């Protein structure tokens, strides 16, 4: 019976020694490391939240812009229809406004051509066969197109053609490299300072030939189109004579469909 109190005494003594032992202090370097890690984590979370908020705001802005542009395009189309109806009702002909935008496709090589033609093709950025570019129409550009007319097919693209070309074949010139336009951020990074932050902005600027057309068009790499389905008829003959070269006005849209 005396063994039990003896056992209790031993346990009590062991507990006493444990209480007397001091817990080793956490080193200052470890404390500092933990504190820095906690601060870094807070900063990272704040940055992540700020970026998320910014992306959300930008997505909303892009959606609103796309909606506005869609309304604008529809209004332009309805105005054209209304004007044509009014003219027809009055027994007149409606003459639409002069086109401001052209799409130019190179259809021939330049073997044995004059240096002047070669230079104009370089200015139009048509360095390879089946390359295509947008051109703002004015007196100077029309004269350039006339010089190289036997080597190009050109006309007036509609909204659908501009849309499909940029979305399907669109590449941007970023740091002198040809980069596929797979994200709005690529457009915003290069053209954000001009108020062009998304693909819809880019399409609108090109189609309407806006104030920043030059910057938007120079950002776009020349389009590399496929050989037209069904082939070409006669490259050396003008379109009005049954060939492929020269101005085909709104019929360029059919050629774009065959090559896109």
Curated annotation (Swiss-Prot):
How it assembles, according to the record, is: Component of the large ribosomal subunit. Homodimer. Interacts with DHX33.
| Segments of this protein annotated with the region 5 X 12 AA tandem repeats | 7-66
Highest taxon of source? Eukaryota
The N-acetylmethionine modification is found at 1
Q: Which parts are the sequence repeats?
A: 7-18, 19-30, 31-42, 43-54, 55-66
Major location (coarse): cytoplasm
Q: What is this protein called?
A: Large ribosomal subunit protein uL30
The UniProt entry, under InterPro entries, shows:
Ribo_uL30_ferredoxin-like_sf, Ribosomal_uL30, Ribosomal_uL30_CS, Ribosomal_uL30_euk, Ribosomal_uL30_euk_arc, Ribosomal_uL30_ferredoxin-like, Ribosomal_uL30_N_euk
Similarity-based family: Belongs to the universal ribosomal protein uL30 family.
Role summary = Component of the large ribosomal subunit. The ribosome is a large ribonucleoprotein complex responsible for the synthesis of proteins in the cell. Binds to G-rich structures in 28S rRNA and in mRNAs. Plays a regulatory role in the translation apparatus; inhibits cell-free translation of mRNAs.
Keyword Phosphoprotein in the entry? The reply is: yes
Against CDD domains, the record matches this protein to: Ribosomal_L7_archeal_euk (cd01657)
Name any one GO molecular function. structural constituent of ribosome
PROSITE patterns xref list: RIBOSOMAL_L30
Extract the PANTHER family matched here.
Answer: 60S RIBOSOMAL PROTEIN L7, LARGE RIBOSOMAL SUBUNIT PROTEIN UL30
Alphabetically ordered keywords of this record: Acetylation, Cytoplasm, Phosphoprotein, Repeat, Ribonucleoprotein, Ribosomal protein, RNA-binding
Entry-annotated residues carrying Phosphothreonine: 29
Q: Where's it found, cell-wise?
A: Cytoplasm
Upper lineage is: Eukaryota, Metazoa, Chordata, Craniata, Vertebrata
Residues bearing Phosphotyrosine are 151
Which pairs of positions does the record mark as disulfide bonds? none
Record-level GO BP terms: liver regeneration; maturation of LSU-rRNA from tricistronic rRNA transcript (SSU-rRNA, 5.8S rRNA, LSU-rRNA); ribosomal large subunit biogenesis; rRNA processing
